[in-house]
């Protein structure tokens, strides 16, 4: 549990260093794309770095712990944790690596939220909850729903749909961004 926190913190710091490097090379507009648990990390990085003005989050959840606890792909992790910790405590411990507490820090950033209608790894109710959280905070995200599951997103034709939605959004958002 602690290593997960440390690994996520390190990923956000590495992203910040990458943005430092891009800015030092003259880039003025920075967008970030994260997929699956990487979407949590991308949102954390964007929430903590004002230079990231565009973010595309591909497979989403407001809570890191809920994905691990309820997702089909991480059932083995839950099995290893059950009896030692419950979801409420795990959610509290992993709150610093969860998107929900940082939603207010997304103000002024252009965002695309993508989820898969039949996702069993990132349960759909969690994805819809994050979309609603963004909307309740008046963040006006673009939303795209894939007609597939989590891993089938990587197979044609769903990978084409996903890629098209991501590239179209990033291209448009970075072109019109004047930060």
Which positions does each model-derived feature cover?
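Alpha/beta-hydrolase active-site loop
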Residues: 1-25
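C-terminal catalytic histidine-bearing segment of alpha/beta-hydrolase fold enzymes
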Residues: 128, 135-179
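The feature captures the conserved acid-bearing segment of alpha/beta-hydrolase catalytic domains
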Residues: 70-126, 132
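Alpha/beta-hydrolase fold nucleophile elbow
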Residues: 25-36
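Hydrolase active-site cap/lid region
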Residues: 43-87
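Glycine-rich nucleophile elbow surrounding the catalytic serine of serine-hydrolase chemistry
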Residues: 34-46
């Amino acid at each position: 549990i602690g290593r997960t926190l440390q690994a996520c913190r390190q990923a956000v710091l590495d992203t910040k260093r990458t943005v430092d490097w891009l800015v030092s090379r003259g880039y003025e507009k920075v967008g970030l794309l994260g997929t699956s648990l990487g979407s949590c990390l991308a949102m954390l990085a964007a929430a903590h770095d004002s230079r990231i003005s565009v973010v595309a989050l591909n497979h989403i959840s407001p809570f890191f712990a809920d994905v691990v606890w309820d997702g089909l792909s991480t059932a083995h992790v839950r099995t290893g944790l059950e009896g030692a910790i419950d979801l409420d405590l795990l959610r509290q411990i992993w709150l610093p690596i969860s998107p929900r507490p940082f939603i207010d820090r997304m103000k002024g950033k252009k965002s695309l939220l993508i989820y898969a209608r039949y996702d069993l790894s990132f349960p759909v109710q969690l994805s819809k909850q994050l979309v609603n959280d963004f909307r309740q905070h008046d963040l006006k995200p673009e939303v795209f729903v894939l007609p597939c599951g989590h891993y089938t997103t990587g197979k044609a034709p769903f990978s084409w749909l996903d890629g098209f939605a991501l590239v179209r959004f990033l291209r448009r958002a970075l072109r019109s961004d004047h930060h």
